[in-house]
Amino acid sequence: MFHQIWAALLYFYGIILNSIYQCPEHSQLTTLGVDGKEFPEVHLGQWYFIAGAAPTKEELATFDPVDNIIFNMAAGSAPTQLHLRATIRMKDGLCVPRKWIYHLTEGSTDLRTEGRPDMKTELFSSSCPGGIMLNETGQGYQRFLFYNRSPHPPEKCVEEFKSLTSCLDSKAFLLTPRNQEACELSSN
């Protein structure tokens, strides 16, 4: 009898706790309209890296020396290619240019990075206006990255990202300082 009462109390406690602290199911994350054939134009253009989250600090360590990053996504020479250019402003003031080519995976929402066969990127919608979320997985790491069209999105957007990713087992969180002016994004 005692065990049944205890089990019932724990059950109701769980229901109450779940109603207060609701985490969405992972399946409730909405993948963006990537159909494996062509990248939607709405996602092309300029993006700012705002925040990252991961199960451990080590998975975000690559962003520790970063002040801000500005990206430009453009359609590639083939409809299944996406060209990504970035300029990284380091905390010491240096500007570091980078380029990637993503390949759309037919029949999937995954993006594969050219030259990095172990890396998989999934894009998700964000409830934040002008926001997008990526889930990057590779050999020994998984991280969620939040981007926005504005270098300074509303604080509630960052809080929503942090809350969502903590529900997805991310214990480490990184917010880019964005104290310095963004570096000029090269056109080539």
Curated annotation (Swiss-Prot):
Glycoprotein is among the record's keywords: yes
Family annotation (SUPFAM superfamilies): Lipocalins (SSF50814)
Binding-site residues for tetradecanoate, renumbered to this chain: 136, 143
GO terms for CC?
A: high-density lipoprotein particle; low-density lipoprotein particle; very-low-density lipoprotein particle
Q: Fetch the Pfam families from UniProt.
A: ApoM
Write out the entry's keywords from A to Z.
Disulfide bond, Glycoprotein, HDL, Lipid transport, Secreted, Signal, Transport
Could you cite one Gene Ontology molecular function of this protein? Answer: phospholipid binding
Instruction: Identify the glycosylated residues.
Output: 135
Localization in the cell = Secreted
A Gene Ontology biological process in which this protein takes part is: high-density lipoprotein particle assembly
Q: What Gene3D superfamilies does this protein map onto?
A: 2.40.128.20
Fill in the subunit field for this protein. Answer: Interacts with LRP2; LRP2 mediates APOM renal uptake and subsequent lysosomal degradation.
Homology family: Belongs to the calycin superfamily. Lipocalin family. Highly divergent.
Query: Function of this protein?
Result: Probably involved in lipid transport. Can bind sphingosine-1-phosphate, myristic acid, palmitic acid and stearic acid, retinol, all-trans-retinoic acid and 9-cis-retinoic acid.
Report the protein name in the record: Apolipoprotein M
